[in-house]
Amino acid sequence: MKTTEEQHNERKRELMEKCFECYAENGLTGTGIKALADACGCTKANLYSYFKNLDELIIESTAYCMEKVEDDFMEKAPTDPKDVVRFVKEVPYWTAKKHGKKYRLMYQIYTHPKYIEHGKKFFEGVNERYTEYAKRLEPKIGIPYTVITPLIFIFVRACVHYAMFEDEYYLKTQMEVLKQGVALFADKYRSQYLNGGNEK
C-alpha cells in the first residue's frame, strides 16, 4: 500500500504532465490557472496545494517532463555501431512527431528572462546525463565517451531543431556528418584496439 507521501508525489507528477501538455497545446501566455485546473480535472485550489505559485508549477513541470522526453529519446539510442544508421534515420522524425510541441514550449520557457537560470541548471543536468550515457556506451561500441558525448550533443541538437522548425536541410546535413563521423571513429578505435592501443 502506498504512503500518503507516495500518493502525493504520484499525483503531483500526474499534474505536472497534464499541465505541461496543456501549455504545449495552448501556449504559455494564453493559458491561465483555470485552463490548467480543467486539464487536470481538479480545482485551482487543488493545484495550489501542490505548487506554491504558477512559476513553481511551470519550472517543476518543465524540468520533470523534459527529463521524461530525454529518457524516451535515450531508450531508443543504439548500443551497437551497426544500429547507428537506423537510429539516425528514424529518431529525428519520431521525436518531432512525439515531442515537437514539448521542445517548443521548453525553449519558450527556458529562454524567458524569468526562467533562464532554471534553463541553465536544466542543461547542466542534460550535459551530465548525456556524459553518463556516453560512458555506458563506450564499452559497447568501442568509441571513447569523450568522443561519443559531443556526437550525442550534435545529434540531439539537430533532432530538436528539426522537431521545432521541420528544417529538413539542416537535419540531413547534420545526420550525414554524424553517420560518417561514427563510421570513422569506429574504424579508428577498432584499429587502435587491434594494434594494442598504440595508434593515435
Model feature map: region roles:
Residues 1-10, 193-200:
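N-terminal intrinsically disordered/low-complexity leader segments
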Residues 60, 73-98, 145, 149-152, ...:
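Hydrophobic alpha-helical connector segments
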Residues 62-70:
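Short, basic, alpha-helical segments at the C-terminal edge of helix-turn-helix-like DNA-binding modules
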Residues 96-117:
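Amphipathic alpha-helical segments used for helix-helix packing
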